[in-house]
């Protein structure tokens, strides 16, 4: 059966017309091999590696396989040795029948690169069949007046073997009336003819029995016999005559059993028994006798067995008509079997790989062959796959197709494809065959890990415990398997002074970040670093993200009082004039807090006072002011305890103790800088010496009285100075800009210092006093000098 295949592109369809055996995809030659039939399974045919000129082991490395046209595995390839072996006993007669030579066509498929080699195997015949006559006895009715030399064709014997192993000669048993003549027939066949050598005489011998022997040409020769019985008849001078020498008819292959194929008819002009014609098959094969039957009286030929166009597409039937007198005639009936679309297309997969790397464009996945046993339009096929798939069907040779990837695949978009290969014929009705294959896309490392965020901000409260989990980073990889396994690491910091290795660590498997030591907000408020995420593919891909760590302040620092100093030294007394108005600024408590935010928000509160209600502390700036007018009944000395508290949780606090002294006639003295006071005191001492000399000269007349009076006055004034607390206010202005500090936690106005002296060798300390106000600045130098002189003289000593 000749199969033509038509394929043309339509969407994903591939249609191709095979008009002849094409050229191999690899441009290879045509291999011809042979083997004797009936050889045992596993018999050696050829070494393909040597025959194809391939290196040892190349057949196995390239996945070489053998594919037969009818998908039957007659041959087996040992890819390691390269030997091509028979996979079963080959019977030439079953494979090819009488056809000679008997050829089996197959293909050799190899990958990397893909190649197809066409080859054929000839099955050589052996003489394993003896000739066989279909009829064990043949009856010939011969009239006694038959002329000498008349030939009577006999039915030939059947021998499945071919060539020299087929029938080569016929013989007849010895007799005095007949001999055998060999005549040629169609398709190179020989037929025996029985030739009359001597006239018959019915009255002398009415019947003869001869043995016909058929001999083949094998070695040793095989033979078969049949009996020829000759009946001598009276004279019958007219033989039957067929209306046609050749009857041609057609029968669809799906015709039912009993279907009338054709009716033959022969006429005999004799009369009586000599005119009675009977019909029979003549020299018919076993296949014809089992497929058809003939009515011996009417000449009607009926279908005895279903037809199959794909097995036999035509029959040649020899019909013999014989009259009652033994005369016969022959005709031939040619039956053409009409093909119907009763065979769906066949799809035979020769090789298939269910996995393909995602970065492998135009990679062969499957090699398959399509076939339709029908003919004509019924045998034309359309082959296609679904639309919108990244695959192509590429036609090869001899009905072969290759399924390849159209381009690079992306496993992250789609990891599995279910492909349906559909083969449809063009018959009516159309028949189709579907073959489903599943292709898995294997992963390659083409995606770097991706962090869930480009930057991370982590918060950790100071004074944390070491190894505290402070946060995590996370990265995902769209690949799979080891290509998606992510390892985290710390990258070298951009700031070379940042001791990152001693601050944080990262879990390489899950990205958890840990603080290695306790953090101190006051030392390090924030820092940043980069983390890397690397997969385990080859080559490895990585990506990095920025991590910012903000240290949150904890209330771990208590307020610290800057003024007045609380260092355990002798307390410094603040002077408050009794004439001060309500709200008069006595002093200011200055404190700071090492924390930040609300932990450093300070508030002030008067905790204890000698006389409650006399003084008040402003909560937000620590200023100590008078709450009411002072009176003579108020005590001269006062002790205040001020509580300084931050706004943390829990709050921390500190206390400051203030000593206040209420004085009369004290306005707003200026205090010089502590370091300037000794020089000015020295100048005043020198001036006092001059005054003393002048005084002594002026009162020389009153020497004794003056001395006594002077000593008495000095002693009196020293006693008064001791009762004031031995505090002296140096003369001279104090530069306000040196202590003008802005801010909620420090001084907001200009203050002066006060030097406090003890009764010892002269150790002193300084502290802030009341602000310098404008009425003091309005006083002239003379007034200041007078007041300072008065102040010095009233206390009775100079500051050194």
UniProtKB/Swiss-Prot annotation:
User: What keywords appear on the UniProt entry?
Assistant: Calcium, Cell adhesion, Cell membrane, Glycoprotein, Membrane, Repeat, Signal, Transmembrane, Transmembrane helix
Query: What topology does it adopt in the membrane?
Result: Single-pass type I membrane protein
Which residue stretches are annotated as topological domain Cytoplasmic? 714-800
What InterPro entries would the database entry show?
Cadherin-like_dom, Cadherin-like_sf, Cadherin_C, Cadherin_CS, Cadherin_N, Protocadherin/Cadherin-CA
In the UniProt record, the signal sequence range is 1-26
Keyword Ribosomal protein recorded: no
Domain Cadherin intervals: 35-133, 138-242, 247-347, 352-451, 456-561, 568-671
- Residues on the membrane's Extracellular side span 27-692
Which GO cellular component terms are attached? membrane; plasma membrane; synapse
What is the role of the protein in this entry? Potential calcium-dependent cell-adhesion protein. May be involved in the establishment and maintenance of specific neuronal connections in the brain.
What protein am I looking at?
Protocadherin beta-10
Gene source species: Homo sapiens
